[in-house]
């Protein structure tokens, strides 16, 4: 799949996550009725996670069989507009009347979601397949979807708020739709960036591969405070896997995830806990965009907490070519794509960019050696997801290899473990270098990097603050630090002189004497003449 088609597909999963649909195959077993839902369920069968892991391992040793695509000539015509008119009847929600607290509704197949996904209700260690029926959906009389076979299948699902709430039918908080994508509304009740089960060869030669979640097992708790547990089987041309998601609805959403991954073929780039987002432009590169809004992005930076304890912040870019940045680490403490800028006036858009969630990946246990990789893809519009971040283990993902990882995803407004003893990057501002009143050289770029936080607020008035700046190439000059007027922030100012078209890697942080005051700001400068 090309980068262009990939980005359109990924973005569509988020757009459609605001419409309703349903998901599994027609059960061939003796049917039963789910409580108060009208859903038809198959006969119960024993289920355990380790049995699912064993199935994934066995699948990796066999030839890949793609998920079913019923009537592809019909499904391809169910475009975004047509798909949005197909709505699942919420009265048929799984657990709408209990015993589980969090009802599930399902997505219909469509142009961007052509593969069927089997759905199971899980309770007491017994799984029952949920049979698909077109009667679960409302659709226009002339909908092309009416031409699909009655045994088609579902595309995905979403979880609703507790059925103890009177508004649960219109309020959802998690959606799984398309390949292995999923997303949540975070703590600000707004969908934005997404995660995936796995990323395969995102920037490797030969094109990216998108394995699919092919089966879901949904186990909703009966008691408040307990998680919704989702089990998933993953399969693709080069990999198979089994996943367990324990999803907790807190002030945001917290997911405890365990995965077992088995390689069917060699993979050059295996991405664990991949995050996908959109960055079109921000205050520091709007000069290259034409739009009435000051900023347009779902996330504005990659934050990292290294195994050595260093805090890093890398503002995102919209480059002129595909760029992959690797940050080598061992046993990382966390990383995430964040939306730090929460000021509405910085966006001025009714689609709530100021409320888009941040997602933080917190490894559980030791992940060993590897690298956090950031992929930035050129885009000329907000409809394309063009940012990807994931962990790539040092261990080769060769045929026959296996991996097991545990991690926690925090979907909220900010990172879950901020450093009180370290100021954070508040803003990155970029302009023409040189001195006022003199000709401005084309190969010089001026940076203003603002920092904010307790260590700066607590400085004595006579404190001397210094910026430690380094560059991979080129020259640093006109270095200056000062308090930002009318605020409690500090900023570092400096010029970067470049001598060629190659990207320049920059690092900067603030110190006072022997005390480090801030996280490390990192930036990739792409000279543009």
Spans of features found by a protein language model:
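N-terminal export signals
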Residues: 1-2, 8-30
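Extracellular structured ligand-interaction cores
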Residues: 80, 114-116, 154, 213, ...
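Terminal accessory/anchoring regions of large secretory-pathway or extracellular enzymes
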Residues: 35-80, 89, 107, 346, ...
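Solvent-exposed N-terminal domain segments of exported/luminal and surface proteins
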Residues: 63-204
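A mature extracytoplasmic/lumenal domain signature
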Residues: 123, 134, 232-236, 249, ...
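Acidic, contiguous internal or C-terminal segments within carbohydrate-active enzymes
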Residues: 232-278
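Extended, loop-rich substrate-binding clefts of extracytoplasmic carbohydrate-active enzymes
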Residues: 194-250, 365-380, 384
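A contiguous, surface-exposed recognition patch within enzymatic or periplasmic domains that forms
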Residues: 81, 174-177, 186, 268, ...
């Amino acid at each position: 799949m090309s980068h262009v088609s990939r980005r359109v597909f990924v973005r569509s999963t988020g757009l459609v996550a605001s419409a309703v649909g349903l998901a599994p195959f027609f059960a061939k077993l003796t049917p039963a009725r789910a409580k108060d839902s009208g859903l038809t369920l198959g006969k119960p069968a024993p289920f355990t996670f380790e049995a699912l892991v064993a199935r994934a391992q066995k699948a990796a040793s066999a030839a890949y069989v793609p998920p079913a695509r019923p009537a592809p000539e019909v499904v391809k015509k169910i475009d975004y507009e047509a798909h949005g008119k197909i709505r699942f009847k919420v009265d048929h929600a799984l657990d709408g009347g209990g015993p589980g607290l969090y009802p599930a509704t399902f997505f219909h197949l469509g142009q961007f979601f052509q593969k069927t996904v089997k759905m199971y209700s899980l309770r007491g260690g017994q799984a029952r397949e949920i049979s698909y029926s077109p009667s679960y959906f409302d659709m226009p009389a002339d909908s092309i979807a009416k031409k699909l076979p009655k045994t088609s299948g579902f595309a995905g699902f979403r979880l609703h708020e507790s059925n103890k709430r009177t508004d649960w039918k219109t309020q959802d908080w998690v959606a799984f739709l398309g390949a292995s994508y999923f997303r949540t509304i975070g703590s600000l009740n707004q969908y934005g960036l997404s995660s995936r089960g796995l990323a395969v060869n995102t920037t490797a030669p030969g094109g990216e591969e998108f394995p699919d979640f092919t089966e879901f097992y949904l186990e909703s708790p009966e008691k408040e405070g307990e998680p919704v547990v989702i089990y998933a089987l993953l399969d693709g041309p080069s990999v198979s896997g089994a996943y367990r998601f324990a999803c907790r609805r807190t002030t945001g959403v917290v997911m405890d995830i365990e995965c077992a991954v088995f390689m069917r073929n060699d993979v050059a780039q295996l991405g664990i806990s991949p995050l996908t987002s959109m960055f079109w432009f921000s205050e520091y590169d709007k000069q290259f965009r034409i739009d009435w809004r000051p900023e347009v992005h779902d996330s504005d930076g990659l934050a990292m907490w290294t195994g050595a304890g260093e805090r890093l912040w890398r503002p995102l870019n919209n480059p002129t070519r595909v760029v992959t940045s690797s940050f080598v680490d061992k046993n990382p403490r966390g990383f995430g794509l964040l939306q730090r800028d929460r000021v509405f006036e910085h966006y001025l858009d009714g689609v709530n960019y100021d409320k888009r969630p941040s997602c933080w990946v917190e490894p559980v246990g030791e992940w060993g050696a590897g690298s956090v990789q950031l992929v930035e893809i050129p885009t000329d519009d907000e409809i394309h997801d063009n940012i990807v971040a994931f962990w790539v283990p040092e261990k080769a993902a060769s045929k026959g290899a296996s991996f097991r990882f545990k991690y926690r995803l925090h979907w909220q407004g900010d990172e879950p473990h901020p450093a009180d003893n370290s100021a954070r990057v508040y803003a990155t501002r970029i302009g023409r270098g040189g001195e006022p009143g003199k000709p401005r050289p084309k190969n010089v770029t001026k940076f203003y990097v603002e920092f904010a936080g307790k260590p700066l607020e607590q400085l004595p008035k006579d404190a001397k603050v210094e910026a430690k700046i380094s560059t991979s190439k080129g020259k640093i000059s006109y270095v200056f630090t000062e308090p930002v007027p009318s605020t409690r922030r500090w900023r570092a100012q400096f010029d970067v002189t470049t001598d060629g078209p190659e990207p320049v890697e920059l690092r900067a942080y603030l110190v006072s004497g022997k005390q480090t005051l801030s996280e490390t700001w990192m930036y990739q400068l792409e000279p543009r003449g």
